Amino acid sequence: MSRKISRRKFMATTAAGAVAVSFKFPAPAIAQAAPFKLGLLTVKTGPLAQGGIQMEQGVQVFLKEKNNMMAGRKVEFFSADTGGNPAGAKTKAQELVERDKVDVILGPLAAFELLAITDYIAQAKTPLLSLAAAEDVTQRRPNPYFLRASACSSQAMHPMADYAAKEMKLKNVITISEDFAFGYEQMGGFQQTFEDNGGKILKKLWPPIVTPDYTPYLAQIADCDGVCQGFAGSNPLRFMKQYAAAGLKFPVVTGETGGDDALLHAFGDEAIGLVSCCPYTADLENESNKRFLAAMAKDYNVLPGFYAAGLYVNCQVVEAGLQKNGGKSDDKEKLMAALRSVSLTETPRGAIKFDHFGNVVGDFFIRKLEKANGKLINKTVKTYHNVSQFWTYDEKKFLQQPVYSRDFPPVKS
C-alpha cells in the first residue's frame, strides 16, 4: 500500500495537530485547579470541646453550601483535634503543614494554643485564620501570616464594660475567669474601660480551667454590685449553676464565650438576666445569618453560637481572598495580602473589615438573656458599631502599655 500522503490530507492532519497542541498551552491554569487544601485545628475533647465541635460544624455548613468549592477549586478538608493544649496544637499544626500540605489553616480555638504555634506559622508562611484571641499576635508581636475575623480577647469586653458602667450603673465589680491568657486579657480589657468610666474592680479571681467546684471562689464574691465572668467552653454552665446555688444575686456580665448562644439549650433559669457582649448574635436579622441558622438547624439541630459563626465567617474570608488572588494559593505572601484586603458586607455577623494588624473591625452586640415562650434567648439590647481592638484608645499609646495579664492592670487599693 502506498504511504504517500496527499497535500490535502497533510494540511488537514497538520491543522488537527495544531488544534490538539493548542489545548496543551494553558497547563499552568490546569495545574492551579488542583484541590485547595483547607486545614482546621479544633478541640473535640475536654472542657473546650463544646466550642470546638461547633467550629467544625461551621466549616462543614459553609463547604456544603458551596458544594465543596472555593474560587473554582475543589476543597480538600483536613480536621485535627489538638486536645486543647499547646503541645497538641503545635504537633497538629506541623502535620497539617508538612504532611498534608494545606494552603490555609483555620483555628486553633484557645489563646494558649495560638501562642504555641504563632512563630511556627510565621516561619512556615502558612496563612492562619483563627478565633483564638491572643492579643499580641495582632498587637505588639504581630504575625504577618495571621488573620482574626472574630475578636481579640478584650475586644468584646471594652463595650461590655462601657455598657456596664453607663447603662447598668455598676460601680464595684468582682471579676472571675480561667487562669490563662484569654481570661487575663478579657478581664484586663473590662477593667481598663470600666475604671475609665468611674468604676472600681474590687478583686480578680482566677480558678484553673478545670474546676469542678467553684465554691472557694464563690465564697469570695461579696460586697459588690456586679460580677464579670469570662469563662469559656462548658465552664459557664457550671459556674452559673453554682453561682445561683450559692444564693448570689449580683448581676453578671460576660463576653462572647460566657453567654454564647450555643449554651442556651443547656442553661437553666439561673442564667436569666446574664448580660453578654459578642461579635455574633443569633437574633441578627440579615439574609446571611438566616441562611446560616437554617443550615445549622437542618444539619445539626442546634442553635449556633460564636464558634460556629466565627468559622463560617472565616471560610467566607478565605473564599473572598482566594477569589481576589485569582484562585491561586501557591504564593502564600500574595494570598495573605489578598486575605487581609478582604472586606465583607454580608456575613452572619454583619459587615467586617480588617485593620493593618489583621484584626477584625465590626459590630459588637450587647445581649440580655431572657425567657420567651418557655425558651431561653439572647435578646440584643444595644449595638456598638465598628469596634476595633483598640476600642476608643489611641493605638500608639495603647501599644505602649503592657499586654493585659494576671497583674495588669493591677487592682487599685
Predicted regions and their residues:
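N-terminal secretory signal peptides and thylakoid transit peptides that target proteins
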Residues: 1-18, 24-25
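C-terminal segment of N-terminal export signals and the immediately downstream linker at the start
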Residues: 25-44
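Extracytoplasmic "Venus flytrap"
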Residues: 39-58, 62, 80-86, 109-110, ...
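Beta-alpha junction/loop-to-helix N-cap segments that form part of ligand/metal-binding clefts
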Residues: 50-55, 69-140, 207-214, 237
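Extracellular/periplasmic Venus flytrap/periplasmic-binding protein
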Residues: 91, 135-137, 144-247, 282-291, ...
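Periplasmic-binding protein-like
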Residues: 96, 100-109, 129-131, 174-177, ...
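Extracellular/periplasmic ligand-binding modules, especially the Venus flytrap/periplasmic-binding
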Residues: 189, 233, 238, 283-342
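Solvent-exposed, acidic/polar segments of extracytosolic/periplasmic ligand-binding ectodomains
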Residues: 343, 347-413
